[in-house]
Amino acid sequence: MTTTNRNNLKLTALTAAVLTLSACGGSDAVAENKNVKPAYLGEVASASYDGISDDLLTAGLGKTGLGGAAPAVVDPLSPTSAELRKLAIFNNYRAILDITAGGGYGTLYGPNVDAKGVVGASEGMIAGTEYIAYSDDGTGRQNITMMVQVPATFNPASPCIVTATSSGSRGVYGAIGSSGEWGLKNGCAVAYTDKGTGTGIHDLQNDTVNVQNGGRASATAAGKASIFTALLTSIERAAFNLATPNRFAIKHAHSQQNPEKDWGKWTLQSVEFAYFVLNQKYGDLASDGVAHLKKLTPANTIVIASSVSNGAGAALAAAEQDTQGLISGVAVAEPEVQLAPDARLSIVRGTTTLVGTGKQLLDYFTLANLLQPCAALVSPSTNVFNTVNAAIAGNRCSALKANGLITGTTTAEQAASAMAALVAAGWQPESSDLQASHYSFATLPVALTYANTYGRFGVADNLCGFSYAATGAATSATPLAPVPASAAVLATSFGTSNGVPPTAGINIVNNNSVGGPLLDAASLSVGGVQDYNIAGALCLRGLVTGTSANAVRVQQGMSEVLRSANLHGKPALIVQGRSDTLLPVAFTGRPYFGMNKIVEGANSRLSYIEVTNAQHFDAFLGFPGYANRLVPLHRYFIQAMDMMYANLKTGAALPTSQVVRTVPRGLAGTAANPITAANVPPIKAVADVADQITFANNVVTVAD
């Protein structure tokens, strides 16, 4: 059973008047610490879930439903908010985790595995109340979605809050399967935010947008309540549609806000929202009989900043920026974090030494976007995500050679040169297996999104000749060209989109393809050659390395997202897979650990855990080519959260920095063996000498 209420947390005009009058009392009254809604928060909507028909963690699907087929929508053109929420939780949970039994779902992790790791027979549904609001500056241009889930097991006598900032560019449910699940199982309130990304899809042809409850509306009707509306006048939009019909603006790419610079701020605001909700629920009434007092504060509440990927980077940023003592400790996995250049730091693994803090995200993504299609030809990966076409990849190799970026006479030599260039740039040799698949599904989408957001480009800028559109089927009258989007796909986009096209039926288009705009991967370069759009790739790279006006804009935005690695002595754990190909350890976890030691010195309480045979996308571990080679990093995320909670609750020591050596599942015939505890040994309290990660004299030494 679900109940909803949009008014129970509003401070009405009457309440405000009562508070004002009570404040006029005599000077002998003791000042009360009243709970006040933060000024940046809009109207708060709430819904309660009974944990039987619906719940906080699985939207009523339970462990079985999350592992099954996508939930049906009765009317695809007009889905209900409840249906969209269920779709969002289903898709976001599965986007983070491997939901195959052989990979550990239902045994190592999952709704039926309790907070102590005990496997149960229940569906793992969690009762409680969910609160949602926008954070905004009054313009409606930000509209950061904030959400707090309070499980029925929350104990105000032993309170805890866990942050769950969305990973990737996902919406507010993006971390439901990572820190969200851990927090709910442990009886903590969970503070979510989409951090200014999420499902903000503006259909420019039809002028429709997403709104907070998941539905779609005309941009005019939505007004300031839109998740995102492109900053175009009606005249500008009409001109854009005439020149480039059937296109879309996407919030993370086109909000012109560079939200990443404020990911720490939004995460801290989500904690403040959680405190407001909890004190409204558990705080005693003030003497006026209307307001509530602050019962829960940072002095008596454990707050763990957490999440994975971009959400993990947001947690680290929040801890760096925390001036109110809101955060007690940090436990994150595979963080997207970018550091100011600092040549004092060196990182050594075996015979390889890298000097400095690593490349910034757009630097290494635009480099990968150039090299990966060619390197794919020698990538050992044979998994289902390797969709690189050998002939087109060969043409990319030729184009790279012509531009002086690789060497070699034959295609094989050129491909080997491209792979060697990636390793020389900082990717670990263990990533070579995954370079092909990452180009197939991740590299260009991320590079294009971040080039746009860092430069604060609008959709009408068509940066580097790229745009977003639905494209026709290969057998249609307009094969692979922009076409009107499916109304049903757009109607359910809140529940299906990951915030970065290609998603929800929206693809990446090369506007400059010879003969007219086409799906980028199939587009034609000068001379009618298919080479994965070398001109577009070179243009994106030039935004990082060049001096053009557009490059200056992008580089300014890049400078705004740099972090300090100063956690102010907070206890912290970072876990990351050595084979991470999306966010390589040489650019993220390793240098963050080293710079934290440099800037904090003896005050540093950060431990860094690097896991062999683990990479960025656990959700892909159920597929051939991934399943037999790699293990779930999520197993170590859970352990890191447990260790951090024990440290904050009882003072238990955090583990020393170390390499955890896992054992791939391998094959039994053509299928991967079921995972066992032997494949994923635990983090040790004290690392063996051969597994230590150490810091001394500004040098991080990582066990090989």
UniProtKB/Swiss-Prot annotation:
Protein's recorded name: D-(-)-3-hydroxybutyrate oligomer hydrolase
Keyword presence, Hydrolase: yes
Cellular component annotations (GO), alphabetically ordered: extracellular space
GO molecular function, one term: hydroxybutyrate-dimer hydrolase activity
Cited function: Participates in the degradation of poly-3-hydroxybutyrate (PHB). It works downstream of poly(3-hydroxybutyrate) depolymerase, hydrolyzing D(-)-3-hydroxybutyrate oligomers of various length (3HB-oligomers) into 3HB-monomers.
Native source organism of the sequence: Albidiferax ferrireducens (strain ATCC BAA-621 / DSM 15236 / T118)
Active-site annotation: 309 (charge relay system)
Enzyme class, first EC level, given as a word: hydrolase
Segment forming the signal sequence: 1-31
